[in-house]
Curated annotation (Swiss-Prot):
InterPro entries: ATP8_mammal, ATP8_metazoa
Primary localization class, coarse: mitochondrion
GO molecular function: proton transmembrane transporter activity
Name recorded for this polypeptide: ATP synthase F(0) complex subunit 8
Gene Ontology annotations for the cellular component aspect, listed alphabetically: mitochondrial membrane; proton-transporting ATP synthase complex
Source organism (scientific name): Bos mutus grunniens (Wild yak)
Protein family according to the UniProt entry: Belongs to the ATPase protein 8 family.
Encoding gene (name): MT-ATP8
Length: 66
Protein backbone atom coordinates (compact mmCIF):
# COMPACT_ATOMS: atom_id res chain seq x y z
CA UNK A 1 0.00 0.00 0.00
CA UNK A 2 1.56 3.35 -1.01
CA UNK A 3 2.32 6.01 1.55
CA UNK A 4 0.33 9.24 1.42
CA UNK A 5 2.54 12.14 0.42
CA UNK A 6 1.86 15.04 2.81
CA UNK A 7 4.86 17.18 1.96
CA UNK A 8 2.82 19.76 0.02
CA UNK A 9 0.00 20.06 2.54
CA UNK A 10 1.67 22.81 4.53
CA UNK A 11 2.13 25.05 1.50
CA UNK A 12 -1.43 24.41 0.35
CA UNK A 13 -2.90 25.24 3.76
CA UNK A 14 -0.80 28.38 4.14
CA UNK A 15 -1.65 29.59 0.65
CA UNK A 16 -5.34 28.93 1.32
CA UNK A 17 -5.24 31.03 4.51
CA UNK A 18 -3.39 33.81 2.73
CA UNK A 19 -5.91 33.81 -0.12
CA UNK A 20 -8.86 33.85 2.27
CA UNK A 21 -7.32 36.69 4.23
CA UNK A 22 -6.82 38.75 1.07
CA UNK A 23 -10.36 38.06 -0.15
CA UNK A 24 -11.89 39.10 3.18
CA UNK A 25 -9.77 42.22 3.32
CA UNK A 26 -10.95 43.22 -0.13
CA UNK A 27 -14.57 42.56 0.79
CA UNK A 28 -14.34 44.56 4.01
CA UNK A 29 -12.57 47.46 2.31
CA UNK A 30 -15.55 47.99 -0.02
CA UNK A 31 -17.95 48.71 2.84
CA UNK A 32 -18.82 52.28 3.75
CA UNK A 33 -18.70 52.98 7.45
CA UNK A 34 -19.85 56.09 9.27
CA UNK A 35 -16.94 58.33 10.14
CA UNK A 36 -18.47 59.98 13.18
CA UNK A 37 -21.44 58.06 14.55
CA UNK A 38 -23.75 60.14 16.70
CA UNK A 39 -25.70 58.87 19.64
CA UNK A 40 -29.41 58.68 19.07
CA UNK A 41 -32.02 59.10 21.72
CA UNK A 42 -33.34 55.75 22.86
CA UNK A 43 -36.10 57.29 24.95
CA UNK A 44 -39.55 56.25 23.81
CA UNK A 45 -41.84 59.03 22.73
CA UNK A 46 -45.08 59.02 24.64
CA UNK A 47 -48.09 58.61 22.41
CA UNK A 48 -51.40 59.99 23.56
CA UNK A 49 -54.17 57.45 23.40
CA UNK A 50 -57.82 58.49 23.30
CA UNK A 51 -58.56 57.21 26.80
CA UNK A 52 -55.68 59.18 28.31
CA UNK A 53 -57.02 62.49 27.09
CA UNK A 54 -60.50 61.98 28.57
CA UNK A 55 -61.64 61.66 32.14
CA UNK A 56 -62.59 58.08 32.78
CA UNK A 57 -64.23 56.41 35.72
CA UNK A 58 -64.10 52.76 36.64
CA UNK A 59 -67.52 51.45 37.67
CA UNK A 60 -68.01 48.56 40.01
CA UNK A 61 -70.26 45.77 38.79
CA UNK A 62 -73.85 46.09 39.90
CA UNK A 63 -74.52 44.55 43.25
CA UNK A 64 -77.26 41.98 43.03
CA UNK A 65 -79.79 41.91 45.86
CA UNK A 66 -79.58 38.87 48.07
Amino acid sequence: MPQLDTSTWLTMILSMFLTLFIIFQLKISKHNFYYNPELTSTKMLKQNTPWETKWTKIYLPLLLPL
